[in-house]
């Protein structure tokens, strides 16, 4: 897990709010599945978290209910402000119901080795990004967040996006007018925030075991969207390879090189645009 989390940290300012977001994470999840098979003896496939199924009560999801077959549940309750402000707007929603260390399920009392970078922002690479800072795995499950922003209606809005530019905007920015104007809280971010704490760390979220299920769902949505118009959508690209195009960088093309550090050899965008070409051989159910 540390190798994957460190890789995510290293490329955070390239792989979010950019033209390589979908493609980079597609191969990242595939690498995780391969690693589970080659190093851990896993014989199954990479599951995805269908956000809509748990949107109304995330704590009851078999993924997050704290049972022996879950990915652990909520963190222990801690004192928190009762409402969360969705900055930079004045909109508030109730906060989560946990917030502390996870002490239930298979990942109870798990120690994370990389630092908490949740306050680092997205302007500069944090100088302490790879410091050894052991701390507990935390969650703050929030059904108010999930029901408002990761429902089936939100998934349908993504799948009905008319272009790759619209799909990118719809997954990153909410449909709520004030939030969309602020360019925040699309289903991708909202799912992170509905789990909270470790998963809500922009840089180190892969330290939450559910990260790969979440991004398999992101990949599933992209794949299903592509399948609705494969002739035009399989190769559809938009954007650059830097977050919010900071600093300014060239538009991505099918020849743009993607890198994952020591986890993988580099790939071109062309090699990761389809789940059924080059080194990929999988598909998602509708």
Swiss-Prot record:
Keywords: Copper, Metal-binding, Monooxygenase, Oxidoreductase
EC top class, as a word: oxidoreductase
Chain residues that bind Cu cation A: 16, 25
Use in biotechnology or industry: Hancockiamide D displays potent cytotoxic activity against murine myeloma NS-1 cells, suggesting a potential antitumour application. More interestingly, hancockiamide C, the likely end metabolite of the hkm pathway, shows potent Arabidopsis thaliana seed anti-germination activity, but is inactive against the monocot Eragrostis tef seed, suggesting that it could be a herbicidal lead targeting monocots. The herbicidal activity of hancockiamide C could be due to its phenylpropanoid-like structural features, which may act on the plant lignan pathways, and hence warrants further investigations.
Cofactor: binding comment: Binds 2 copper ions per subunit.
Pfam families documented for this protein: Tyrosinase (PF00264)
Annotated Cu cation B binding sites: 215
Function: Oxidase; part of the gene cluster that mediates the biosynthesis of hancockiamides, an unusual new family of N-cinnamoylated piperazines. The NRPS hkm10 and the NmrA-like reductase hkm9 are proposed to convert two molecules of L-Phe to the intermediary piperazine called xenocockiamide A. Xenocockiamide A is then converted to hancockiamide D via a series of hydroxylations and O-methylations.
Family: Belongs to the tyrosinase family.
Protein name (record): Oxidase hkm6
Domain of life: Eukaryota
Cofactor: Cu(2+)
One annotated GO molecular function: metal ion binding
Biological or metabolic pathway of the protein: Secondary metabolite biosynthesis
EC number assigned by the record: 1.14.-.-
